Amino acid sequence: MARITEAEVRHVAGLARLAITDEEVTHFTEQLTKILEFAEQLDELDTTGVEPTTHALDLKNVLRKDEVRPSLPREEVERMAPDWENGQVRVPAVFE
């Protein structure tokens, strides 16, 4: 039987930068345990002869040729950008 611990719920919440209460930790622990137990039922299925699949639907990417289209002049982009460095728009860091 799959069981997720409160420590694991707190860890995942921390990774997601979520502040959760003790009550929420208990609630999510119970919910996630039920979800894992439900998913374990798939182990009981006989999948002999069933081809592995990566997608539920047989979709294909539709590719097209690249085409050059008019865009803003570089000078206008530079004028509008809050920060510009070495010919590129400088943005705040996403990762620490």
Swiss-Prot record:
Cytoplasm as a keyword of this entry, yes or no, is no
Q: Name one GO molecular function term.
A: asparaginyl-tRNA synthase (glutamine-hydrolyzing) activity
Catalytic function, reaction form: L-glutamyl-tRNA(Gln) + L-glutamine + ATP + H2O = L-glutaminyl-tRNA(Gln) + L-glutamate + ADP + phosphate + H(+); L-aspartyl-tRNA(Asn) + L-glutamine + ATP + H2O = L-asparaginyl-tRNA(Asn) + L-glutamate + ADP + phosphate + 2 H(+)
- The enzyme class is ligase
Name the Enzyme Commission number(s) assigned to this protein: 6.3.5.-
Q: Which SUPFAM superfamilies match?
A: Glu-tRNAGln amidotransferase C subunit
Q: Where are the transmembrane segments?
A: none
User: What is its quaternary makeup?
Assistant: Heterotrimer of A, B and C subunits.
Role summary: Allows the formation of correctly charged Asn-tRNA(Asn) or Gln-tRNA(Gln) through the transamidation of misacylated Asp-tRNA(Asn) or Glu-tRNA(Gln) in organisms which lack either or both of asparaginyl-tRNA or glutaminyl-tRNA synthetases. The reaction takes place in the presence of glutamine and ATP through an activated phospho-Asp-tRNA(Asn) or phospho-Glu-tRNA(Gln).
Task: Please give the family membership noted in the entry.
Answer: Belongs to the GatC family.
Its protein name is Aspartyl/glutamyl-tRNA(Asn/Gln) amidotransferase subunit C
**Species in which this protein is naturally found:** Exiguobacterium sp. (strain ATCC BAA-1283 / AT1b)
